[in-house]
Amino acid sequence: ELKLSRQALKRWFSDKYLENNPDTYKKISSILSANNMANFLRVYELFVKHKNDEDFEKIQSKTLVMTGEHDIGSTIEMSQQLNNIIKNSELKIIKDGKHLCGIECADDVNLAIKNFVDKNE
């Protein structure tokens, strides 16, 4: 198991979730460990050097902006900024969520999506 995998998993999930879900830990760790690390690091470099020059203000569709409360990769502040730029957007912060709250907090994420879709049909 690579140190990089362990670090990523600690950023993406709460300690409690990882303790209670060892199979998920092993599966995702295995996927990360099987990655070509040179390519993996090149992709991460894109995130670091990325210029925020998208035309988000041109988005006309109703948009759900969502992040986990404890996500250090897609922070609440980043999501608030995006929510302010996209005119028809709604911000949802998933309580206790980290980067992969779609897995760890699946019920909350799914409910937020369902509520957003139901409200905007």
Residue ranges and their predicted role:
Residues 2-57:
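Conserved alpha/beta-hydrolase catalytic His-Asp/Glu region
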Residues 8, 44, 82, 109, ...:
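Hydrophobic "lid"/C-terminal helical patch
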Residues 37-38, 59, 98, 104:
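Conserved Class I S-adenosyl-L-methionine
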Residues 59, 65-67, 71:
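Short beta-strand/loop motif that positions the catalytic acidic residue
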Residues 60-61, 88:
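Active-site acidic short loop of glycosyltransferases
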Residues 72-78:
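Conserved alpha/beta-hydrolase "acid-adjacent" motif
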Residues 80-89:
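Active-site-adjacent alpha-helix of alpha/beta-hydrolase-fold enzymes
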Residues 89-121:
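Catalytic active-site module of serine/aspartate enzymes centered on a nucleophile-bearing elbow/loop
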